Amino acid sequence: MTQTKERKRFKDLNLLDRFLFAEAMEDQQNMELLLDIILNQETHLKQPTQTEKELRRTNEDRQVRLDVYTVDEKDVIYDAEPQKINTKNFPKRSRLYQGLIDSNLLPPGSVDFNALNTVVIILITPFDIFGHELYKYTFHMKCEEVPELQLDDGATRIFLNTHGKHLELVSEELIELLKYIELSTDETAEHCNSEKVQELHRKICQLKANKQMEAKFMQAWEEKVLERQEAYEEGKQVGEERGTDRERQEVAKLCGRLMELNRMEEMQRAITDMTYRKKLLSELEL
């Protein structure tokens, strides 16, 4: 197996790192600050934020974990996800998230589709998915023949790019927030004028100074390393037992890539399901 990446020190984590993002956003006030800036609104959440919320339609379906899931007083649902690696599938991944969230909103047999909540999905990345150098891309369904006609289905998907260039299209506060999310340090905070970003930084400093939180991070990292090693060795063994030289190389390469992306369940399925393995090889351009 390739050498495990060196563990990042807890104090060096940024909000783009899932562990710190999830722990920070469990604080309801932090999540409200984040949504206030991104959506330019005043947010009041009515229940505690859920992290790593698991969704699936049936036991046989693929499980999806939503990084940070919450609901405001108007029953608007928010899902926020930091994504450090460009898997080149974010538009369709956001579609999957939307579908799974919707499928869990109505009780079985209900046909009152107007009861579906408004849903806002937010993906935060340190790269530009769409190539137009924007900080913020907001998508709603609309009519091609009548562009000003919105479908008004209550679904919004927002993609945030920390490396945007068009300052005039977003608030200074959002730009400061995105810079801070990518590099959550004292130095970055010193250059932020936003009181909300400063408040968020104070909370992050408190988190990073918490020894129990540091121990939790170390334990989570060690468990993830063991899980990856076990899955990799299983894939390697199955490949050696069943495949040709080419197939063994494909399995090893795919397992390594899926480990980097923390897509462990998909890796385990790909080990024994050749059709699914080929699909992933094509998706990841391996």
What feature does the model see in each segment?
Residues 1-286:
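Elongated, amphipathic alpha-helical interaction scaffolds
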